[in-house]
Regions:
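Formylglycine-dependent sulfatase
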Residues: 1-285, 289, 293-330
Length: 330
């Protein structure tokens, strides 16, 4: 869609949407790909996943040297300067795999953390260092935008794909659950936006989804969306206007994790009410999130519960099964 609006499109970093044709980045709307086809790396420095090398420059297999976070930062900065020379604006999706396990920050970054916090645990220290290293990379990318004269006309969106992982000693604050859960600790994350000279410095607590990013960008570039999508444009919210974003059903589904036996984890929310099944072998739980943000006191079934349940079932029907990609064999 961004290409229809005249944009050059690129993805740097983690793809995780397919390992072979027709599910490769260059076949899915991106003019340029420099990154990793897989999900997580077994090592941030060898970049291998179960013995396979999924690093690519477009479709060419490559074997770059260095920490993955530094590589993705450098590649994004290089792209920004090259894109500046073209006569078209650019859309860049930069996907770091940090701070996903394995927790392998560069040694010098871990030393900085332990110098400040000598009593920090081994695991927590590595996690903090991995995040700070990535944060430095984001800063370097923003500096590249500024040096290339493109910061003033670039909207930057930064967010996480899930809540922190307690096995890595992440801290999700007072909310229940962590990565992999349907509780808010697993699915509710902060999102930061920056557009120099266009967005006020402020905080809003509206509920928005990752799926809202696409229609928002289309709205921003005045590109109509004529097919069914799940998200809504939140451009009025960015323009400091009042906007209701929770007057709709919001869905979360997870199908991929091995310990759920091919079944699903699900959640649906409407305004302050939330219905979830955190594991397919556990009962449904129903919460009022305004009164019980820690999701500790399930409610009894009522009319709203019935509406949420029907919406969840309808979402099953519309979404259907998702075919798995054929696994590669070595």
């Amino acid at each position: 869609m961004m290409k229809k609006a005249g944009y050059q499109t690129a993805i740097i970093g983690k793809w995780h949407l397919g390992l072979e044709s027709p599910n490769l980045p260059n076949e899915r709307g991106f003019d340029f790909f420099h990154g990793f086809l897989g999900d997580m790396m077994d090592d941030y420095n060898t970049h291998l996943r179960r013995g396979f090398n999924y690093m690519r420059l477009n479709t060419e297999e490559i074997d770059p040297q260095g920490h993955a976070t530094d590589l993705f930062t450098d590649w994004a900065s290089d792209y920004i300067f090259k894109a500046r020379k073209q006569d078209k604006p650019f859309f860049l999706y930069l996907a770091y795999n940090a701070p996903h396990s394995p927790l392998q920050p560069p040694v010098e970054w871990e030393k900085k953390v332990r110098k400040r916090h000598p009593n920090i645990s081994e695991t927590r220290g590595k996690l903090v260092a991995l995040i700070e290293h990535m944060d430095d990379g984001v800063g370097r990318v923003i500096n590249s935008l500024e040096k290339s004269g493109q910061l003033d006309n670039t909207l930057i969106i930064f967010c996480s794909d899930n809540g922190g992982d307690r096995k890595s000693e992440a801290n999700n604050g007072p909310v229940r659950g962590d990565k992999g859960d349907m509780y808010d600790g697993g699915i509710k994350v902060a999102c930061s936006l920056y557009w120099k000279g266009h967005l006020e410095h402020r905080r809003v607590n509206n509920l928005v989804m990752m799926s809202d990013i696409f229609p928002t960008l289309c709205d921003l570039v005045q590109l109509p969306v004529n097919h069914r999508i799940d998200g809504i444009s939140v451009l009025p919210l960015l323009r400091n206007q009042e906007q209701v974003t929770d007057d709709r059903y919001l869905f979360w589904v997870r199908r991929e994790h091995g310990d759920i036996g091919g079944k699903t984890q699900n959640a649906v929310r409407y305004k302050e009410y939330k219905l979830l099944q955190n594991r397919p072998f556990e009962p449904l739980q129903y919460f009022n999130m305004k009164q019980d943000s820690k999701e500790s006191q399930p409610l009894e079934k009522d009319a709203v519960y019935s509406k949420l349940y029907k919406a969840m079932v309808e979402h099953y029907r519309i979404s259907g099964a998702i075919p798995w990609q054929r696994p590669l064999t070595k």
